[in-house]
Regions:
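Active-site catalytic microenvironments in core metabolic enzymes, especially phosphate/sugar-handling
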Residues: 1-175
């Protein structure tokens, strides 16, 4: 097992795969959840990120939380046609990376991230360069621990990995 890191735990999701949508629904039923409005990110990204951070810091005092921009296919199509596919994806990734950085500054040390590009943006924003690979949480998805200070317990996945309770299982594995 990996060394414990302490600190709060959060799930950040930018994936809109079928598996991730089921995971978002399962996590939302058990824990506080904040849906990031993509249109709001385009109108005032800094304000939107600030609102998410205020909400999350308060909620994370009592429980893990979920912050997501995941949406069903028809909503994703609408967002992409309105803002452009690449631009919409980039804005979501930048926002989630900024949220991760803000949460890390507030003491969060356990991050579960859904979405390949989102995961890359978060790991980069947190300055993670080297990882210790820990036990498997789900096929193809291990728990990891960053080197350096502060240390982060991390799990990230591309969209269709894991069962419906993956987020809760991953948070438990990262304790």
């Amino acid at each position: 097992p990996l060394a414990p890191v302490g600190g709060g735990g959060v799930v950040l999701s930018g994936s809109s795969s079928a598996a991730t949508l089921a995971q978002v629904a399962a996590m939302s039923a058990k824990h506080p959840a904040f849906a990031i409005g993509v249109a709001v990110l385009f109108s005032n990204k800094d304000k939107a990120i600030g609102e998410v951070l205020l909400w999350a810091v308060e909620k994370l005092k009592a429980s893990p939380a979920l912050i997501y921009a995941s949406a069903p296919p028809e909503k994703v199509s609408e967002i992409q046609s309105r803002f452009g596919r690449e631009k919409a994806g980039a804005v979501i990734e930048e926002a989630i990376a900024a949220i991760a950085t803000g949460l890390a500054k507030s003491g969060v040390r356990r991050f579960v991230v859904a979405g390949g590009e989102t995961s890359g943006a978060v790991v980069s924003a947190l300055g993670v360069k080297v990882l210790e690979i820990g036990p498997q949480i789900s096929p193809g998805v291990p728990a990891t621990l960053s080197y350096g200070e502060p240390r982060y317990a991390l799990s990230w996945k591309s969209g269709n990995f894991g069962g419906a309770d993956f987020f809760s299982e991953a948070l438990e594995a990262l304790k």
